[in-house]
C-alpha cells in the first residue's frame, strides 16, 4: 500500500475509533442477544468502526456538498473516545519531558485539527463496504492498556490489519494509538516532528500547525 493510501486509511481508522456515540450502544445490545458480548475494549473498536462506515454511507451526499458538516461531525466526537493529550505526549516523546501541561494540550489540539483538516476529505472516498473483524485482545506491558487487533475486510482485496491501543481513563476506554499494517500513528508523527521540535518550542510548532505553515504528513515545514 502506498504511503499516501496509508495516511488516508490512518485517518479513517482514527475517525472510526473516535466517532462512537449513543447509537454505538445499539450495536452492542444487538450483539449481546446473539452471542457473548465482547470485552469493553473490543466493543469500542467494533461499534465505533461500524458506526463511522454506516454514517459515511448514509450521509455521503450531504458531506460532499457541505464539507463544514463533515468537519463538524468529526470534531464533535473527536474528544469523546480519543485520548488526544496522552497521544500528543507520546508523539512529542523526549520533547514532552518537563513540558507544561498547557503546552502539551496546545500541541494536541493543533495536531488533531491539522490531521482532520488535511485528511478528513479522504473519508468521503473510502469504501464503506468494508467489514470490521476483531481478532484478539492483548494486555500491553506495564499495565499500559490493551491492544485490540482487528482487520478491515475488503470485498476486492486482502484484509487490512488495524491495531488499536486503548487505555482506561476515568473508567472509560480511550484510544491513544492506531497502527495500520504496522504503521503507528504515534511513531509516524513522532518521526515527523522530532526535527522541528529540536529547533523550536512546542508552542511554536503548534502555532505553525494552526496556520498551515507546517502540516501533518508533510516534510516538517509544510512545504
Locate predicted features:
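Early exported N-terminus immediately downstream of N-terminal targeting peptides
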Residues: 35-119
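Surface-exposed, charged secondary-structure patches
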Residues: 117-160, 212-223
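Compositionally biased, proline/threonine/alanine/serine-rich low-complexity intrinsically disordered stretches
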Residues: 28-50, 54, 207, 211-223
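Sec/Tat signal peptide C-region and signal peptidase I cleavage site
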Residues: 22-28
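Solvent-exposed loop/turn segments at secondary-structure junctions
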Residues: 96, 113-114, 139-140, 153-154, ...
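Low-complexity, intrinsically disordered terminal/linker segments enriched in charged
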Residues: 177-223
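Bacterial N-terminal signal peptides that target proteins for export
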Residues: 2-16, 24
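Short beta-strand edge/turn micro-motifs at domain boundaries
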Residues: 159-187
Amino acid at each position: 500500500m502506498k504511503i499516501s493510501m496509508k495516511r488516508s486509511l490512518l485517518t479513517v481508522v482514527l475517525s472510526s475509533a473516535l466517532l462512537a456515540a449513543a447509537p454505538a450502544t445499539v450495536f452492542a445490545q444487538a450483539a449481546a442477544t446473539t452471542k457473548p458480548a465482547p470485552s469493553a475494549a473490543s466493543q469500542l473498536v467494533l461499534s465505533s468502526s461500524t458506526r463511522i462506515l454506516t454514517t459515511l454511507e448514509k450521509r455521503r451526499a450531504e458531506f460532499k456538498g457541505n464539507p463544514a458538516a463533515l468537519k463538524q461531525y468529526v470534531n464533535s466526537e473527536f474528544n469523546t473516545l480519543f485520548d488526544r493529550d496522552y497521544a500528543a505526549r507520546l508523539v512529542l516523546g523526549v520533547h514532552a519531558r518537563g513540558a507544561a501541561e498547557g503546552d502539551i494540550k496546545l500541541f494536541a489540539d493543533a495536531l488533531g485539527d491539522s490531521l482532520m483538516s488535511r485528511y478528513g476529505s479522504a473519508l468521503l472516498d473510502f469504501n464503506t463496504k468494508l467489514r470490521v473483524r476483531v481478532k484478539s485482545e492483548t494486555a500491553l506491558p506495564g499495565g499500559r492498556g490493551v491492544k485490540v487487533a482487528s482487520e478491515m475486510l475488503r470485498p476486492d482485496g486482502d484484509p487490512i490489519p488495524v491495531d488499536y491501543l486503548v487505555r482506561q481513563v476515568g473508567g472509560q476506554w480511550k484510544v491513544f494509538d492506531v497502527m495500520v499494517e504496522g504503521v503507528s500513528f504515534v511513531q509516524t508523527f513522532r518521526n515527523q516532528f522530532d526535527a522541528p521540535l529540536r529547533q523550536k518550542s512546542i508552542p511554536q510548532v503548534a502555532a505553525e500547525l494552526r496556520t498551515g505553515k507546517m502540516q501533518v504528513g508533510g516534510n516538517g515545514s509544510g512545504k
